[in-house]
């Protein structure tokens, strides 16, 4: 009888070294080039600094809210997503949670692939969103 072979150690993916990212508020950094046409995004430099591990941006939703445009059920194929309300309020629907009014200071996580939508928001709403990984797919669903 031979001695059983040792279990192989899991291969750990080596990521490039992360760097420091500093982002100061500048109005000109808000761009209408993101996922939603009714939003402006301020990239905080996290995706580049983390080599795609994570993404963080400030989202400014453009008012007034048009529910016909924004209330589209969808999900994101992500590993992690969290949102923090910096200013104003946003009313959301999340599968398994229902409708929730998030006000300044509110924070929430959305599990991977959870179906959700925005129902309404204040004209001054700003959100901080952190997502892993930085590149991900969004899937629009039939209502």
Where are these regions (language model features)?
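A short hydrophobic beta-strand segment most commonly corresponding to one strand
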Residues: 1, 56-58, 109, 122-139
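A short, N-terminal "cap"/entry segment at the start of jelly-roll beta-barrel domains
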Residues: 1-65, 140-143
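A short beta-loop-beta micro-motif enriched in histidine and acidic residues
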Residues: 36, 49-54, 65-82, 123
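Short, conserved beta-strand element in jelly-roll/cupin
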Residues: 58-62, 75-92, 130-133
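Short coil/turn motifs at secondary-structure junctions
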Residues: 64, 117, 134-135
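Short beta-strand His + acidic residue motifs that chelate non-heme Fe in jelly-roll/DSBH
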Residues: 72, 91-93, 110, 115-122
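Short acidic-glycine-tyrosine-enriched beta hairpin
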Residues: 96-114
């Amino acid at each position: 009888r031979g001695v059983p072979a040792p279990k192989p150690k899991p291969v750990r993916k080596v990521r490039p070294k992360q760097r420091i990212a500093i982002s100061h508020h500048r109005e000109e950094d808000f761009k209408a080039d993101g996922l939603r046409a009714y939003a402006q995004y301020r990239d905080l430099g996290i995706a580049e600094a983390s080599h795609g591990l994570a993404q963080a941006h400030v989202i400014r939703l453009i008012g007034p809210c048009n529910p016909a445009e924004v209330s589209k059920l969808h999900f994101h194929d992500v590993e992690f997503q969290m949102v923090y309300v910096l200013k104003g309020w946003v009313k959301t629907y999340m599968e398994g949670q229902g409708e929730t009014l998030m006000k300044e200071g509110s924070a929430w996580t959305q599990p991977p692939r959870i179906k959700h939508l925005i129902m309404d928001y204040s004209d001054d709403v700003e959100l901080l969103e952190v997502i892993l990984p930085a590149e991900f797919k969004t899937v629009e669903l039939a209502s």
